[in-house]
Amino acid sequence: MADRSARRARPGDDSVGQFVIGAEIGKGSFAQVYMGKHKVSGAAVAIKSVELARLNKKLKENLYGEINILKTLRHPHIVALHDCVESATHINLMMEYCELGDLSLFIKKREKLSTNPATHDMARKYPNVPNSGLNEVVIRHFLKQLSSALKFLRESNLVHRDVKPQNLLLLPSPEFREVNKLARPILTASQDSLVPVAGLASLPMLKLADFGFARVLPSTSLAETLCGSPLYMAPEILRYERYDAKADLWSVGTVLFEMIVGRPPFRASNHVELLRKIEAAEDVIKFPRETTISSEMKGLTRALLKRNPVERISFENFFAHPVIISSIPGLVEDDIPKPEASEQRSSSKDTRAASKSDDPIASPRKYSFRRHPTDNDQIRDQFRRVEPPSSAAESAPSRQTSAFSGIAAEARKQAAAEASARTGQSSRNEPGDNLVPRRPQAQPSTSAPSKPGLYEERRRGISNASLNRSNRESSSPTSAALANDSARAPPQQTSRRVQAEEREKAAQDVAFERDYVVVEKKHVEVNAFADEMAANPRLGGQGTPLSPKSGQIVRRATQQGNPTSTTGAIPAAPSRTMQIAQGTQRHYHERGTSLSASPGSTASFITKAIQDASLRLLGIKYPAGLTKGASPPELYNPYPAYPTPSPPVGLISSGKQSTPVDEDARVAQLIEEHATRSDVVYGFAEVKYKQLVPLAPSAEHGLGGTTLEDMPTGEEDVLTVEAIVSLSEEALVLYVKALTLLAKSMDIASLWWARKNRGDQANNALSSTRDSVNTQTLSLRINSAVQWVRSRFNEVLEKAEVVRLRLMDAQKRLPDDHPSHPSNHPQGSESVNGASAEGVFLTVGVTAEKLMYDRALEMSRTAAINEITNEDLAGCEISYVTAIRMLEAVLDNDEDAPKRRLSANMDDSGGDGEDGHAEINADDQQAVQKMIHMIRSRLTSVRSKVRMISNASKAQQQSQPQSLIRRRSGDVTPRSVPSYSS
């Protein structure tokens, strides 16, 4: 415990701020949760301690932004954040304490609820159904409270994105707390934080927790993250698509199904299998025979568990569903509300009334078979008496009138007035300035536009879309007339109209990207495809080792030290340390269960992902070309760009494999060649990166180095601000270039995978046993290459993000009159070379192609000098090969452009012409090709010299042992002794 916080460094000093830390009550992948209490009032809190080592600078900034929002969010069914205290090693979040644990534990231990004093009466009144889930009364109670929290988030333009039973925390019922006044007090964020606005006062109170953190906290690898909560993720998230707020509704459906049945609706060992099961079910949700549940509940569950977001029930219809707004059937007499309670609630001055008029909070009196009318305000006053004085001192009248106006409006509506119930939802576009922002101003991380002006235009478009959507939902005369027409229309016509409206809404959401969030770090197309290949049993899985002779790509050590050093950094975990989302949402009808690209696509989803990464980092969108036509020249022998200790010298293999004889071999060679070129560019970028992050690498950090926060304060004494800007710009463009080459490797692999899945049966019927073995070997080889590309892609993307943040920070520290200072690039202006993104501007002339050309020229000249003097011929060969690969990376696919144009399957779209920043003109192409030809000549010459020297050395070694044998024979054999015999 002593190392948990700087405030607890001394023995016995177990406190953070105004709170004393107790025993550990929970643990997650990135944080530990402790029991705590306030030093003055003794009220209980939950202290979540987040490790700072897992957060880089950007993530910390985003986390603090989320924390500031959470500190102002006040809703009875959302776990409140009291305070945040940062120590030297941790960020400690003081949250509301929920002593009954989470809903998953509640469901798991449902047979033992009668043994807990806080749930004993509930289990007696509403027993669970044998071999099933919870009682329907309890389910409806929890669902009402969850919908109340989601409605509040919806009105505040917030999306939870991680609704699951583990994030639904429970408190003892208000009646239990009223009777047991000696129980431990709980620190509340407001006077009515423990007063439910929906459900029954005799049942446990539900609170939604941990929303928003999933976006800003770093996740673990993709597989580990999906093992945490994939069973509740929407199919669009599992397909690695952009998703809107309707993803929460799918999660609500899975939680509802689990409460009914006692288990999730879909279970699988991995997310790929889970997605296939969801697709195979075809929206048919079956309930076990033992389940005793009403048809209304089944219908709502099926409406929520629609795999197509367009067909899924809308938020408006969900909030207006009879299960949500109607009274709960099957209540015992104690919990049946009085009819007049509805009228009292409508006229109540408290705007935090129950979410629906006919679902009041029951009196705190327990088990009286005759209920006396009790005023709603008196009930709330009785509940407030059990709150600690520290929370009672807080006043929130202004917050109640602003933040909960939508909920109060909804509380005054009846089920029959569904159309008028939407009048209070227009406030969603006008949240309080101190509560939540209208929309987060940060750009989507993987789809940042190349120009700030364009982003501002899109932001205005988003705002207009929100207004249009709210206008449709408001009680304008037009909408009222449409509602009346819908009420009078036949059911089939109404259904068609509703479906058409839903599709129109979805189209507008896509057009304006309203309410869309981008999956970061854990949902990546690159990792999805690699996971699918790794999980395929025909490829042997990730655990199948391959020898270097089979063509497996061996990851070389990351060069972090001096270029002449042989000390490499510890490579990043090959799982999924960094991920990027697909840039364009695809309709689910357009894709099968496979995550590979469609056969006819010239720019697969991986290319779109890398284009979004380029936009995010630089504002550069590279052409989406895919290598086709003849194979590149055979001379490529992959070598690391700089000396490393890992044998063999080659990145992939010796390069002595024969010319490809079939499609699989050609694909394997193309993938490896593109990966090898990317490795050369990556090595060049590492030279820049190691100057920005010069400390020794450590296994504690995923980047093979240290984080920005852990750098020594004296580093700026070594590098000037101008030098940091220059190095950051150069490293950034080189990393993006490496990403494009890696993406092209994935493009080739995805098309091959699609063709292979389509033609397996025919090929298996015609192929011989020998061909099958050869195909299996090549498939394993391609799978190994894909896994290496995925690992390198994640590593490069993360390092590029670090460099981008370093560049932005350095540019802010430049003199105000410096051309690269942000003040000299006001919003709406463009970078001269077009390479700009939000907050990132590159100096004119800084391009990856120019840097690579100059580097290749320098390396070849140095190698030529050494070749003339016969010094380090092996190093000369490495330099020549590296220079050739670097120049080929400059040309990218331009060396076989004429062949591609002759291909009928290749379509040179006009969009590439617009992105001409990544293209080079014809004169430059000829100059680069001429340089490649010259270096190849020198490479042939130096290899001839190496062979001659090797042959001479072998001949000398062969002759040397014979002379040694003759010399040793005379030394060892005894000389003849003259005979004296007669």
Curated annotation (Swiss-Prot):
- State where composition is biased (Polar residues): 463-481
Q: Where is the composition biased (Low complexity)?
A: 388-398
Note the Gene3D superfamilies from the entry.
Answer: Transferase(Phosphotransferase) domain 1 (1.10.510.10)
Q: Where is the active site?
A: 162
PROSITE patterns (UniProt xref): PROTEIN_KINASE_ATP (PS00107), PROTEIN_KINASE_DOM (PS50011), PROTEIN_KINASE_ST (PS00108)
Alphabetical list of InterPro entries matching this protein: Atg1-like (IPR045269), ATG1-like_MIT2 (IPR048941), Atg1-like_tMIT (IPR022708), Kinase-like_dom_sf (IPR011009), Prot_kinase_dom (IPR000719), Protein_kinase_ATP_BS (IPR017441), Ser/Thr_kinase_AS (IPR008271)
What Gene Ontology molecular function terms does this protein carry? ATP binding; protein serine kinase activity; protein serine/threonine kinase activity
What does the record say about tissue specificity? Uniformly detected in conidia, mycelia and appressoria (at protein level).
Q: Which reaction does it catalyse?
A: L-seryl-[protein] + ATP = O-phospho-L-seryl-[protein] + ADP + H(+); L-threonyl-[protein] + ATP = O-phospho-L-threonyl-[protein] + ADP + H(+)
Q: Which GO terms describe its biological process?
A: appressorium formation; autophagic cell death; autophagy of mitochondrion; cellular response to nitrogen starvation; cellular response to potassium ion starvation; conidium germination; piecemeal microautophagy of the nucleus; positive regulation of conidium formation
What membrane topology was assigned to this protein in its record? Peripheral membrane protein
The principal location of this protein is cytoplasm
Q: Could you tell me which SUPFAM superfamilies the record lists for this protein? A: Protein kinase-like (PK-like) (SSF56112)
**Subcellular locations according to the entry:** Cytoplasm; Preautophagosomal structure membrane
Outline the extent of the Protein kinase domain.
19-324
Give the record's family classification: Belongs to the protein kinase superfamily. Ser/Thr protein kinase family. APG1/unc-51/ULK1 subfamily.
Q: What is this protein called?
A: Serine/threonine-protein kinase ATG1
- Species source reads Pyricularia oryzae (strain 70-15 / ATCC MYA-4617 / FGSC 8958) (Rice blast fungus)
Query: Source organism lineage?
Result: Eukaryota, Fungi, Dikarya, Ascomycota, Pezizomycotina
